[in-house]
């Protein structure tokens, strides 16, 4: 009875710990230099976590602890492999990938964001993805231009 229970538990745990892959964006994997460095760091951290999990003696716990790092290794390895590093813009005439743009909204709020790759985007830290609606409406525009979609108007105040 105990052997059958152990085998059943192991098989059940194994199937539970095979996590589905993280979704990969269909968009080109554009990144800044810092974005590539961050992806490489996250890949290294996932590998270290996986290696630490492999040192656990109990097989079911080892599988549980290795599941997330293994999924992250697959994701970050693919993101590093497909990364297209875009150099910082050489001009502040128009909004481009890597630009920091300050704009005002119709309600008077003034916001500043840097336009970066999808994996680097963190609106709370001041960066948005180049595929976000706000970034799409600003790319290619100049100071004084109005971008936006629908009822959302954004006037560009500065580009750095």
Model-derived segments and spans:
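Interdomain regulatory linker/hinge segments that flank or connect interaction modules
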Residues: 80-87
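Non-DNA-binding regulatory cores of transcription-related proteins
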Residues: 87-154, 160
């Amino acid at each position: 009875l105990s052997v059958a229970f152990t085998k059943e538990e192991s098989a059940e745990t194994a199937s539970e710990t095979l996590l589905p892959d993280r979704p990969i964006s269909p968009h080109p994997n554009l990144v800044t230099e810092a974005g590539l460095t961050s992806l490489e760091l996250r890949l290294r951290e996932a590998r270290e976590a996986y290696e630490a999990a492999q040192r656990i003696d109990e097989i079911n716990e080892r599988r549980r602890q290795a599941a997330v790092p293994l999924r992250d290794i697959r994701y970050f390895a693919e993101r590093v492999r497909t990364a297209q590093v875009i150099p910082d813009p050489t001009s502040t005439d128009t909004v481009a990938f890597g630009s920091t743009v300050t704009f005002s909204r119709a309600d008077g709020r003034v916001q500043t964001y840097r336009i970066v790759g999808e994996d680097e985007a963190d609106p709370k830290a001041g960066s948005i993805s180049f595929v976000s609606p706000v970034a799409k409406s600003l790319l290619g525009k100049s100071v004084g231009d109005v971008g936006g979609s629908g009822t959302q108007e954004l006037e560009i105040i500065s580009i750095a």
